[in-house]
Amino acid sequence: MTKIKICGITRAQDALEAALAGADALGFNFSRKSPRRIDAETARSIIAGLPPLVTPVGVFVEQSPEEINDICRHCGLLVAQLHSDDYDAEKTLQIKGVRVIRVFRPSPGFEVSQVRKFTEKTGCRSFLFDAYSPAMAGGTGQSIEAQTAGSLFDETRDFSWALLAGGLKPENVGDAVTLIRPWGVDTASGVESGPGIKDALKIRQFVEAVRKADRSLTNCC
């Protein structure tokens, strides 16, 4: 089944709604520039109340590896999502005690070989492909062009677990799963009524759209 990550959690009630709807992972954004920014104490409190088998993921843009390690340990995060090109192989290897998801935002001239080289240097095999925007690291609601996304996943499938992000919402995530077949999907703005405020109905619709696509793939293959 396609894994589902609901990102930009800022409230305990939203975290619980997402977990009950069937989300596999929840994202907590620590970027100082994000409208979905959460502080460490609030994140820690929410994570402590999560049901078992729901994975808490920290999203980092500006923090140093040392800061990431401290925040992950304090909050009980299990995964660090590195959402900036500043996190090169050297910095990634300094992150300890958690799994790493490295984000790539394909811009003009991007080559898949960059992803493979990153794996060779770090051993990291978990990636997230998000739409490129010079103004914001993520959560823009913009989508990766379909042909580009298809090529990315086809060319990285043999050595990675990759999630698709960027503009996904209940109305289009089913088609994305069917056409691209990512290992997982990630959404923030696609299930919100406002930045950082999740819409419980949209979350349930998003999860059901993914599961419906999963069933169609199972039945056709």
From Swiss-Prot:
Superkingdom per UniProt: Bacteria
- The UniProt record lists the EC number as 5.3.1.24
Give the Gene Ontology MF terms in alphabetical order: phosphoribosylanthranilate isomerase activity
Q: Name one GO biological process term.
A: L-tryptophan biosynthetic process
Name the UniProt key words of this record, in alphabetical order.
Amino-acid biosynthesis, Aromatic amino acid biosynthesis, Isomerase, Tryptophan biosynthesis
One matching Pfam family: PRAI
Pathway the protein contributes to: Amino-acid biosynthesis; L-tryptophan biosynthesis; L-tryptophan from chorismate: step 3/5
Question: In this UniProt entry, which cysteines form S-S bonds?
Answer: none
Catalytic activities: N-(5-phospho-beta-D-ribosyl)anthranilate = 1-(2-carboxyphenylamino)-1-deoxy-D-ribulose 5-phosphate
Similarity annotation: Belongs to the TrpF family.
Q: What is this protein's record name?
A: N-(5'-phosphoribosyl)anthranilate isomerase
Q: Which organism is this entry from?
A: Chlorobaculum tepidum (strain ATCC 49652 / DSM 12025 / NBRC 103806 / TLS)
